[in-house]
Amino acid sequence: MLKRLANRQNGFASFSCSSVGLRYGRTNPSTKRSFSLFQSVADTFLTVHEASHIPWIVLVPLTTMTLRTLVTLPFSIWQRRRILKQQELRKLVQPITPIIKLRLAAVTNKKSRNAARISSNGSFMPLQLQNAGVLTPEQITLLAVKETRKRQKKLFKKYNVPLWKNALLPMVQIPLWVTVSMGIRTLTETQLIESFYPSWFSALGFSSFDLSSPLVAMPLLAPILVGTLAVLNVELNGRLMFSSSLSSQGIKTISRNSTRVQEAMTSILNVSRLGCVVMLAMSSQAPFLLSLYWISSQLFSLVQNIILNWIYPYQR
């Protein structure tokens, strides 16, 4: 009886120790299967850091540049060249719209004259009841736009530049950004102090700051850099969006802020600006290592957009 009671107490003690170990020690992969990808990213960072002895403040930007160059840069170049091809094809389709409008207007005028002649010889009837084929100017514009889009879609498919492929870059870039961010966040759940600093960096007085917490010595440094680079990216992309809407098609028109395209692009820019404010607030409370990844990613995007706009400009 005493032996059975002792075995039961030993089993309870071993269970308590194992539960404490799972809580405060290394995370058991079986307990968080849905976040195993983030843990793998954190373990990869830790393995590379211990094997190469590269400081964290160098390893994270270097990894960012490598991933963006190998993964997202080819998609960005591919998308930029595809958009340029789409713009060239739009120039071919654009003259179709006024031609279709003229044809529909001519048919409508002919039918309306016939209807007016019948009403003058006989009893008066409303135009809508006399001839259902008479189109209003709004209907003519709508039919012309639909026909133009139909021909544009066929032309894009013929040259293998459909519009749905423009969503491939966000589908690759956003999951990559989220995965690396959450992996670094998992890495900084415990205290992370750099031990491989070079001598010149130690002389600046930053040889022992905690990378898993915000930068206490200069708390506004990371938010200012993240916010500034994010705003520059948004405004640069916005300028390219507005400048390439009609002028890239070789058509000079007066700016109309009331059009649906202009309103949609303005809404996208406003949401992006709001996202910059959110990132600025998050970086003020995020670990410095995570803010460093955001800074390097935004900087890479800014330089990439400037270079691509110089090599493959939207306006020709």
Swiss-Prot record:
Its main location: mitochondrion. Keywords: Membrane, Mitochondrion, Mitochondrion inner membrane, Transit peptide, Transmembrane, Transmembrane helix. The chain crosses the membrane at residues 164-184, 214-234, 275-295. InterPro entries: YidC/ALB3/OXA1/COX18 (IPR001708). It is found in: Mitochondrion inner membrane. GO terms for cellular component: mitochondrial inner membrane. The keyword Nucleotide-binding does not apply. One of its GO terms (molecular function) is membrane insertase activity. Residues 185-213, 296-316 are mitochondrial matrix. It is a multi-pass membrane protein. It comes from the Eukaryota. Disulfide bonds: none annotated. Residues 235-274 are mitochondrial intermembrane. One of its GO terms (biological process) is protein insertion into mitochondrial inner membrane from matrix. Present with 468 molecules/cell in log phase SD medium. Required for the insertion of integral membrane proteins into the mitochondrial inner membrane. Essential for the activity and assembly of cytochrome c oxidase. Plays a central role in the translocation and export of the C-terminal part of the COX2 protein into the mitochondrial intermembrane space. Belongs to the OXA1/ALB3/YidC family. Interacts with PNT1 and MSS2. This is Cytochrome c oxidase assembly protein COX18, mitochondrial. It comes from Saccharomyces cerevisiae (strain ATCC 204508 / S288c) (Baker's yeast).
